[in-house]
Amino acid sequence: MDLQPDDQELHRWPTLSEALEEIKAIGKISGPTTITGLLLYSRAMISMLFLGYLGELELAGGSLSIGFANITGYSVISGLAMGMEPICGQAYGAKQWKLLGLTLQRTVLLLLSTSIPISFMWLNMKRILLWCGQDQEISSVAHTFILFSIPDLFFLSLLHPLRIYLRTQNVTLPLTYCSAISVLLHVPINFLLVVHFKMGIAGVAIAMVWTNLNLFLLLSSFVYFSSVYKDSWVCPSMDCLRGWSSLLALAIPTCISVCLEWWWYEFMIMLCGLLANPKATISSMGILIQTTSLVYVFPSALSLGVSTRVGNELGANRPAKARISMIVSLVCAVALGLAAMLFTTLMRHQWGRFFTTDTEILDLTAIALPIAGLCELGNCPQTTGCGVLRGSARPTIGANINLGSFYLVGMPVAILMGFVAKMGFAGLWLGLLAAQASCALLMLYVLCNTDWMVQVERARELTRTCTMSSTPLPISSTISESNTKKSNNKANLEEVLCVSDEPVKSISLETDPLISTTTS
């Protein structure tokens, strides 16, 4: 059992050996996750290449459909799935194995339930696009693409929770291997459907769905044959339908936070359409968003790594190590931001040539790329900070920060600089810079004022281990039975999640200054 750290231990900087040890621990998770992210990015590029092969109309329709799917579906599924991350991370640190399996099952049910109304929305996509004033021909092509993408919602509802389930147990390399195999198969699948069978844009959509299905089947096979599931396996039962309050309390604000950031970039594209020469500005914005998506792979992987580390350490009652994880990851994030800024500045005249030869688009891209690099100087620390907040089960703070930074600061600045100050395309990116800067500053303020002893107390409320290791998980305990067991120090994480959330809520109100009392 870990001894409680003294006050000095929680306020000192880590030694060089501690920092190197933590870098190694984070790198063990973030390294394979980065490779996986790059592989999945290349898969998206392959799909875009095949859309371009089909023609300008198919490329426009497919791009519009993917943007619509991101806003209304993929961002929601991804955000809700991340709600299970702090529960699984802290459960793994506290050796509450069975809760891992239960949380996996509950999250799958949550995502499958969410996919149903999203599917109905996608079925009516053409009507929605026409109501928004989109071109009839492009809307028809986009509608065809998204109809064949509907099964992807259900496969992602299985895939996202499975990936988080493995990552919170520090199992990341198998995901990289499985992603590599699925991406390698993605090219021949596209060739078979698009070129050989001449299925057109429907073939590209089916290929994307097929690739996600392959990835899920490969990961499921690994989980089964490696027996990684045995300690956490819980037979599906009605217990999956209980204890949803804590999962939803984490999933909903995480989803809001993810959606707010994803939607901002779609909003930027809409604003580009209002500028002079919208074709050039929209094309340049597309190039820059693809570039920032590529750069984002690295801070995103770091964020996922530190989220797992912080959750594991808090669950294991080691607040000092959780704090070291935060410090080391933020230093790494600043280094990533500086590297991104240097890259975009040096490559501002060459990078756009990989995508186009149009002089006007190249000029706009060269002007905005250094600003995009400055944005990454704020984006990398704030993305990493979001990982720390997720690992310590405080996603509502992240949602509040994103709302305030992107929509109360960034949006007005973008409109002011782009249209009122007549700075045009560069002015829109200055709005994003203002959003990222304010987001990073608020995130750093919250993290620097975190009381790690209080955070470990919050985690302990979820991770009180039973006095007897053989005690079965009391999933069906009544409220009175739960209170009795807690008084005898036999409560565990599942009791707290299923029966009573009040201890966790009361502590979160004391330590989360940006949480509104209505959402906590």
Annotate the PLM regions.
Residues I35, L39, R43, T72, ...:
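Residue-level hotspots within pore-lining transmembrane alpha-helices
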Residues M1-T33, C88-F155, L173, S182-I252, ...:
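Short alpha-helical transmembrane segments in multi-pass integral membrane proteins
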Residues M45-M48, L59-S119, L159-R167, S284-R348, ...:
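Small-residue-rich hydrophobic transmembrane alpha-helices
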Residues K28-S47, F148, T211-L215, L219, ...:
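Transmembrane helical elements of multi-pass membrane transporters/channels
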Residues E56-S63, G67, A142, I146, ...:
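Small-residue hotspots at the loop-to-helix junctions and early N-terminal turns
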Residues Y41-A60, L129-G133, L192-M199, C255, ...:
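Helix-terminus/linker motif at the lipid-water interface of multi-pass membrane proteins
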